[in-house]
Amino acid sequence: MTGVQTCALPIFEDHAPAAAPAPSSAALARFGEFMGAATAPGKVNARAKELIAVALSIVRHCEPCLRSHLAAAFALGITREEIDEAAALAVEFAGCPALMFYKETMRVLRA
């Protein structure tokens, strides 16, 4: 360690951050309820929410998320062209790394 303090490095060499406690089953259940409410159709319909979820999965580079939301999108009848448009928005906001992630994920899914 160089002794330079940054957000990613501990202040002292012998100081390690404490491990976060594991979430309780009640907390996980509440999070599951939140996820269900967030993805349920409302003022924004299910198709739009899945396209948003696809774009956010690309921005966050979350491959399991992208796989899940692509499957849900295709089940709703969303076309590859619509998914590509959502991906283009993700790339607009997240740049080249998002484009590379999307292309690689789609290549793997076609294999």
Where are these regions (language model features)?
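Short, small-residue-biased leader/transition segments that mark boundaries at the very start
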Residues: 2-9
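Extended beta-strand/beta-hairpin segments
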Residues: 10, 16-28, 86, 102
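Iron-sulfur (Fe-S) cluster-binding segments and ferredoxin-like electron-carrier domains
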Residues: 28, 68-80, 105-106
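A generic alpha-helix surface/boundary motif
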Residues: 29-34, 50, 66-68
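Helix-loop "lid/cap" segments that line or gate small-molecule binding pockets
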Residues: 35-39, 72
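Short amphipathic alpha-helical boundary/capping segments
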Residues: 39-45
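Short, thiol/selenol-centered motifs that function as redox-active sites or metal-ligating centers
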Residues: 52, 56-68
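C-terminal structural segments of small proteins and small subunits
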Residues: 84-109
